[in-house]
Amino acid sequence: MEDQETKRITKKPSRSIIISLKDIPPLDPSSIPSMKPMAQDHHNVGMQRFQEKTDFKFEEEDNAISSFSNIQIDPNSTRSISLEKKLAPKPDEEHTTTTKPISKDDESKTRRGSAKSVLHEMCASKRWRPPVYECCNVDGPCHLRLFTYKVMVEIRDSSGKTVLECFGDPRRKKKAAAEHAAEGALWYLEHVKTKPHQ
């Protein structure tokens, strides 16, 4: 009876792939979303509320004076303030030279989120089992622990079942180590698995 059960299990083709992040090329810095804060639209809210409650109205400042408020002046400087106003750049010039149209690929990369969440969403969309994270190695003394995580993804497709194991680099925090392992699994699924076998 046991022989029949083992025969059933061995009939299904099973592969195991182990990937170390040391073999993977480094990430392209342009693919990492920037950490710039969102533009603040509420810079004059206090002034508007003040004007609503009182009859006092302020005169509008021109671009040179408003941009002058952002300039730091050295107290030891002998230059006059009027000269500083003339040297202040116009805000329109700054925005036209530094902004570029954002493509759909850039928008999707900035909205993706953490590697763990993207990997989980990818597994759910393809109806695979959710990824399993496991701490496989703990090194160092108790005050300088380094955690190494691995992520296991069971890939089911027409050719059978493949178990993908990706190991991350040792990190000081468990969350960062698991995130690094998830990045390796994502890299494999996006670059290697999508290409046809040659």
UniProtKB/Swiss-Prot annotation:
Organism: Arabidopsis thaliana (Mouse-ear cress)
Signal peptide location: none
Compositional bias ranges of the Basic and acidic residues kind: 85-110
Entry-linked PROSITE patterns: DS_RBD (PS50137)
PANTHER family: LOQUACIOUS, ISOFORM B
UniProt KW rRNA-binding keyword: no
Pfam family, one: DND1_DSRM
SMART domains membership: DSRM
Record flagged with keyword RNA-binding: yes
Protein known as: Ribonuclease 3-like protein 1
UniProt domain DRBM: residue ranges: 114-191
Alphabetical UniProt keywords: RNA-binding
GO MF assignments: RNA binding
Annotated stretches, region: Disordered: 85-115
